[in-house]
């Protein structure tokens, strides 16, 4: 009951904009901390009960529960007090209906935190990933972000022969994503490309709304060809979607953020990755907005110094879904003409795998 009262008060103070799931909290003490004492009483009662239990397993389980309550107590206090001026605080709606609320806090810049922990003079640390770079062999962007400015960087070549295994197509004739006819042309090109590979594709979106709209408009297309459409947000768990995609050889998966990275589908099942839009981070997300503000305050260019490098890394992750072994092959299609029409587009092209690139006009 106390929890409901507390989060009802949080919900009344959070004024979410249309389509937004985040509300940035800029001042401390948004609401009264009515959970402080109930949580304290609860973990105290659990600890007292645990002291009288001889069974070690049961006693440890109770003590672990008490520890989690103490952590919740500390987290709520941290959020409401906002004592760390170098962090950003926000409330986020969760669940399909957006009915659950979570309290969030994160440091705007992690470099000062990680530098002494991982990269100090008496520390030994190796940071490795296939997508740390933004086209810069010295990995300068990553090193500055994590406080490893003075750490040597090594770029190791790929074991894959991208010249033979991958083809990249950039559709220059696509309208700007902000134009009214963008969605219509997006559907046109997705259909055209899917026919070429008979499905077997990941279609990567940056917007849940656009994904749902395109999926709805293309229902007849998929029925006509007898291909299964797996659309994120339809109720199927992520892992189940991936398993179904692997088993259904001509299926097509529409995914957003969580499908740009961390998904492996080697073999013929994935022969085509379609990128609907450059994956720029939403600039009004509280954490992104705070980082952009910090860069501008220090005299930097927030778009080129943060938005572009972050999007380059995510694009590389998305494109990287295609080739997962030396036996894989296929095509990547980018349906965002900004990679060839905007000055910053060359940064994206330079960061892509060394595969043949064809500009479709």
Regions found by a protein language model. Give the residues of each.
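ASCE RecA-like P-loop NTPase motor cores
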Residues: 1-361
């Amino acid at each position: 009951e106390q929890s409901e009262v507390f989060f009802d008060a949080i919900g009344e103070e959070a004024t979410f904009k249309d389509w937004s799931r985040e509300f940035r909290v800029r001042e401390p003490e948004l609401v009264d901390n009515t959970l402080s004492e109930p949580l304290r009483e609860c973990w105290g009662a659990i600890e007292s009960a645990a002291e009288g239990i001889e069974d070690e397993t049961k006693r440890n389980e109770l003590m672990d529960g008490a520890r989690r309550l103490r952590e919740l107590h500390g987290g709520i206090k941290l959020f409401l007090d906002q004592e760390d001026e170098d962090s950003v605080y926000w409330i986020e709606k969760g669940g399909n209906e957006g009915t659950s609320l979570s309290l969030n806090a994160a440091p705007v810049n992690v470099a000062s935190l990680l530098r002494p922990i991982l990269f100090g003079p008496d520390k030994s640390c190796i940071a490795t990933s296939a997508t740390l770079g933004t086209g810069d062999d010295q990995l300068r962007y990553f090193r500055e972000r994590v406080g490893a400015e003075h750490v040597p960087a090594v770029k190791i070549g790929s074991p894959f022969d991208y010249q033979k295994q991958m083809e990249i197509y950039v559709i220059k004739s696509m309208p700007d994503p902000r134009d009214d006819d963008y969605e219509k042309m997006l559907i046109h090109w997705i259909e055209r490309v899917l026919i070429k590979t008979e499905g077997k594709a990941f279609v990567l979106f940056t917007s849940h709304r656009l994904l749902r709209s395109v999926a709805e408009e293309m229902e007849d297309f998929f029925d006509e060809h007898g291909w299964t459409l797996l659309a994120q947000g339809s109720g199927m768990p992520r892992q189940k979607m991936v398993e179904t995609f692997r088993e259904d050889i001509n299926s097509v998966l529409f995914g957003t953020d969580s499908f740009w990275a961390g998904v492996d589908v080697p073999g013929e099942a994935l022969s085509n990755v379609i990128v609907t839009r450059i994956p720029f981070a939403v600039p009004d997300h509280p954490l992104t907005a705070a980082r952009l503000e910090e860069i501008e305050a220090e005299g930097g260019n927030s778009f080129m110094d943060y938005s572009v490098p972050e999007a380059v890394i995510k694009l590389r992750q998305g494109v990287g879904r295609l080739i997962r072994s030396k036996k894989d092959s296929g095509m990547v299609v980018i349906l965002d003409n900004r990679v060839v029409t905007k000055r910053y587009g060359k940064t994206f092209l330079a960061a892509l795998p060394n595969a043949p690139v064809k500009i479709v006009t």
